[in-house]
Amino acid sequence: MNKKIILITIFLVVIIGIIYYFSQSKSVDIDPLNCNYIINGENFNLIEGKSEIEIPNSSSKIITYYSNIETYNDFNNDKINDVAGLIMQNTGGSGTFFYLAVVLGGNKECQSVESVFLGDRVSPQSIEVEDNRIIVNYLDRALEDSMADFPSIIISRQFLVENNRLIEIIPE
């Protein structure tokens, strides 16, 4: 009788372990430094975290960088880790534009969603995850401030990934 109980207990522990293992998010080797990103409908293929595209009839370039502010989570509920990070882009003028970018980890290739504009010359602070929401914190300027002023107003924006799109959540 004791042997039966021990065998049943071992069997149940193994089954529970297998179920737990397969219920956890699986890690996929997403390398956000070497992905294609969609910004304003255009593709920018980053290599080692950077892309340079010459602007026709100009000596300027569109330079796009991946920042080191990022977080990993299963944003689209497919049990595979995704990455949310910040992209910086200079289009040849005085501005440095910041975007929230998400790459889904469904396969070995990067599958990015359309990036969301955060601001011009803002000061990124962090990206967090809470209840599958992406929370981006950064400093910005007041509307009446000059672009030469340092950003000093704390901004916190929240996003969800739905149907392979970033959707902003406006807190009530």
Question: Which residue ranges define each predicted feature?
Answer:
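Structural signature of eukaryotic scaffold interfaces centered on beta-propeller domains
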Residues: 69-77, 127-129
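Short, surface-exposed beta-strand/strand-loop-strand elements in extracellular ectodomains
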Residues: 98-104
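Repeat-based blade/solenoid architectures
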Residues: 60-69, 116-124
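Short beta-turn/strand-loop junction motif enriched in small, turn-promoting residues
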Residues: 71-73, 88-91, 141-144
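Short consensus segments that form the blades of beta-propeller domains
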Residues: 61, 90-94, 145-151
